[in-house]
Each structure stands twice: as C-alpha cells, then as structure tokens.
C-alpha cells in the first residue's frame, strides 16, 4: 500500500502580545494545549529589537527546561507551539516555531494542520533556488512570503495565504506585530482572548485563554487573519472564497472538554452525541462505561439517555501519552496496555455498554474489549460516538492512508467480530451534525466530516492521484451512494 509522504500534524499554537512575562504565559498556555501534541515544543520571543527562541523534543517540560526559560525572560511578545508529527519527521529541525533571521527583519512562525499542496509548492520553490532546512510545511509559507513582491509584510502574508491549500492555522511573530491566520474553511480553530490588563492572546483552543484568566474575544473565521500590535487588534479577510467546514474531529477527539469551538462547548457536544447514539442504537445492559478520557462525556450522555448507571469501569494512567497520536503502531499497542486497566470489581459478571469516541485502526478498542472480558465482563456492547472513520484525513490528522482505516475495508459486523464485541453500532453522520449543532449555511451545517464521508472541503491537490488509486471497494460503494458537495479542489458542486 502506498504511504503518503508529508507531515500530517495535530498541533497547538499560542501567541501573546505586549506582556512583561510573555514567555512564562506562553509556557502556561502551551501546557494547557499539551493534549494536541507531545513530541516537541518551542517558544519564540520578541521585543522592539530582536527575536530569539528555544525549542526541544518531548513534552513541554522536557522540551523547554528552566535554563531555557531564563533566556526568554524580559521579552514582551511571544508565540509557542506543541507538536505531534508522523515518524520520520521527528528531528529537532522540525520543531516549531521556526525562526528566521533576514537582513531586514526576523520572523517566528508556527502552524497547526497540513498543507495539501505543500509538496508541489516546495518543488516549484526549489526550482527557483529556495533552500529548505526542514521537512515541515511551515517552511513553505515563509519562502512564499519572502519571494513575494508585495510592498509590506502583511500584504506578502495575504498573498502567500491565498496560495496554500489545506486545513491550517498560523501564528507569526515579528518585532512589529503578532499575526494569526485561519484556512478558508476554518477546519482548524484559532481564537483571540484578552487579559484584564489589555494583553491580547491567540490560541488553538479557548482552554489556553481560560487558564490565564483572560476573556474570550472572538473566533478567527474562515479565510481571516488577525494583526495584533501596539495599536490594538484588527481582523481582516485574505480571501472571500470561503466555506465554513470546522473539523468534526476537534469536537470528537482532539479538543479539551472545557474548550469552546464556534460557540459550542466540547463537553456539551460530546454528551449530546452520546444521547443521540443512545437514541439511534439502544441495547440492554447493566451499565455504561467510557474509554478515558475523550469518551467520558459521550458515555455519560448515553447512560443518562438510556437510564442506566454510568460507572468507572476503566482507569487511565494520566501520565501516558494518547495512543491515537503515538507515531507508530507498535507504540500505540504498547500504550494501551500501559495506560488503561479494567476495574474488575465493577465489571465482573456485568453486561456492559462500552462507549468510545471513534474506531480508527481498531487495535485499541480490541484490546479494551479483551481486557474487560478478561476481568469478568459477561457481554461488551461497543457504541461509537462518531460515524465510521472510513476515509483518510489530509487536513492535520495522522491518518493519511486507506490501509490504516479498518472501516475502509471491513463492515461493522466484520469489525464487531474482529474486536470481540457482542454488538457494535456507530453514530450516524446526521446524528453527529445534529449533536454538534452548528447552523452555518454550508454543507453539513458547517462541519468538516471528510473522514466519514470522503467529502473534502479543501480539496485533495497533491494527494488526489494516490488517494483515488487506492480507494477500497467499500469506499467506492459509499461514494457512489452518497452526495458529495465538494470537488477535488474544494469548490462547491453546484
């Protein structure tokens, strides 16, 4: 099976302007975004004269140590990044923010997401003489900015943003301003907050604003960029060719439950999805349990709707990184054994409804079902609070091949047998859309559900040929039976 090259990320970005402890607050903000990436972190700081940065591999506490933080003190502006990346792209050179020193200015830049035309842009830039120092998509936009003929940095940024495709947010720092930008579909979230002293904050999630005691100001919407400087804050559009398609996986899995995306609290959405799942797929049992942590809200909703007790049948070791975003399959499988254990006294002899947020590869849920049955569970009915994860994601989630997706080749009945469950049911696409409750005048009410439908709102670009060449029979069947709203370049099909 062909493996798509490229750097698929699910990361967290943070920025702050005009605070005497900018680096320290950035560190705190990144700590609240640690769930978005555990393989590296970095901070770039700025004042009126210079930019400097520190970065490292591992969790934030491993990547940026006390002596590094000391070197970042005394600066008023900062951006920061926590990173997840596919294996093979884990070197220090790819840890963000990337920092560039040019003859006329210095720039720090970091991003969350994936640029689906980065490969072709990179090839064209190299033909023009560009030299790349990392394999990160982020470096592509820096080359585009520097090669622009636009008269100002802001104009060059706007011009460059129009050339890149995919799901992304950027945080960019110069000595003059802090910039943030969101893709034309708002697939990846970016929010603005304000502290009591007037300091502005940029972050991937509202939880990073809340942790600093700041107030939420606004979401940055599809095709918008924000400029924060000593004059204040300005939000502008760099393109009017926009269709809102916020990643459903942000609500389902990635975001913290205390975050709010497009006005919808993540915990409330997950609980609503559990209730909807119970309405769509009830089953007789003694109790409901959830897979910690991202499934607990949905499990509580399912239990409440069906009128069963919600029990803690699984306990998680909170100090083990999340398995879905571990870079290799071997590490993911080892991680399940280390991080979860069944509570035997709770599950022994019981018929259990096990709620999980998604089935991607199937390995994790298979081990959990076995763990519960080994601990004495009589029956385990699996309920998934999202639709079948049938199609690759190219917008910033590390699932970019059909071969990785169990639902691409197996039916729910076949997956039920594979994971050893007594029954298996998924939330419908319509049920997911209703549970999240967005009301944009856009396909899927403003959600990006590409992994469940094969409908890609930002298009496919560099991935198109190989994606189409490796569609499974089951994927082709789904596509032939269901309406698609977007073409391969992300244009709306009229």
Swiss-Prot record:
Residues 1-10 form a propeptide. Binds 1 Mg(2+) ion per subunit. It catalyses: 5-phospho-beta-D-ribosylamine + L-glutamate + diphosphate = 5-phospho-alpha-D-ribose 1-diphosphate + L-glutamine + H2O. Coiled coil: none annotated. The active site is at 11 (nucleophile). Keywords: Glutamine amidotransferase, Glycosyltransferase, Magnesium, Metal-binding, Purine biosynthesis, Transferase. SUPFAM superfamilies: N-terminal nucleophile aminohydrolases (Ntn hydrolases), PRTase-like. Its EC number is 2.4.2.14. It comes from the Bacteria. Its cofactor is Mg(2+). Residues 11-231 form the Glutamine amidotransferase type-2 domain. The keyword Chaperone does not apply. Gene3D superfamilies: 3.40.50.2020, Glutamine Phosphoribosylpyrophosphate, subunit 1, domain 1. GO terms for molecular function: amidophosphoribosyltransferase activity; magnesium ion binding. Pathway: Purine metabolism; IMP biosynthesis via de novo pathway; N(1)-(5-phospho-D-ribosyl)glycinamide from 5-phospho-alpha-D-ribose 1-diphosphate: step 1/2. GO terms for biological process: 'de novo' IMP biosynthetic process; purine nucleobase biosynthetic process. Mg(2+) binds at residues 294, 356-357. NCBIfam families: purF. In the C-terminal section; belongs to the purine/pyrimidine phosphoribosyltransferase family. Catalyzes the formation of phosphoribosylamine from phosphoribosylpyrophosphate (PRPP) and glutamine. This is Amidophosphoribosyltransferase. It comes from Staphylococcus aureus (strain MRSA252). The gene is purF.
